[in-house]
A protein has these predicted regions:
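Alpha-helical transmembrane segments of multipass membrane proteins
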Residues: 23, 63, 96-100, 123
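Membrane-water interface at the C-terminal end of transmembrane alpha helices
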Residues: 118-134
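Mid-chain, well-packed structural core segment of small domains
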Residues: 64-98
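Interfacial loop at the N-terminal end of multi-pass membrane proteins
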Residues: 4, 8, 26-51, 70-73
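Membrane-helix boundary connector in multi-pass membrane proteins
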Residues: 94-111
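Hydrophobic core of alpha-helical transmembrane segments in multi-pass integral membrane proteins
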Residues: 53-67, 118-123
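N-terminal signal-anchor transmembrane alpha helix
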Residues: 10-24
Length: 134
């Protein structure tokens, strides 16, 4: 298996964990101190619960783009993924900066390494050459 495919699968697995965390927040898990700058320690308000569901959907959409670009899944997205993967890289870079700068020590400890791994995987997928079909 190529590095590109492994990076894409790694991105998708990590993204599934991030999405599960967001869904748990939306469902009432008391982990608000570990998300969104720790502005809402404990349970999320109804508005933040909606935001968590939206974030989970966006994370999985980005995973789909990365998987498509690597040729792992969603072949119908292949052409669009050529440029969308760079949007995923940009979002990953911003996410890493924000997670390093957050006032929440817990969020920084947990999510900065996750953001780094997501950024690294997306850069690998975006920059590695497409291998020919076998």
């Amino acid at each position: 298996m190529s590095i590109r495919r492994m990076a894409a699968i790694g991105y998708a697995v990590i993204s599934a964990g991030v999405a599960a965390f967001q869904i748990a927040l939306a469902a009432g898990a008391p982990w608000g101190a570990y998300a969104m700058g720790g502005v809402s320690p404990g349970h999320y308000s109804p508005a933040l619960r909606v935001a968590a569901v939206v974030q989970a959907a966006l994370v999985m959409l980005m995973a789909g783009v990365v998987l498509s670009r690597a040729g792992v899944a969603l072949p119908a997205w292949s052409r669009t993924s050529r440029w969308l993967v760079w949007l995923v890289v940009a979002v990953g870079a911003v996410s890493l900066v924000l997670n390093l700068a957050t006032p929440s020590a817990g969020e920084r400890l947990v999510w900065a390494p996750v953001a780094f791994l997501l950024l690294a995987c997306s850069v690998l997928v975006a920059t590695e050459r497409q291998e020919p079909e076998e």
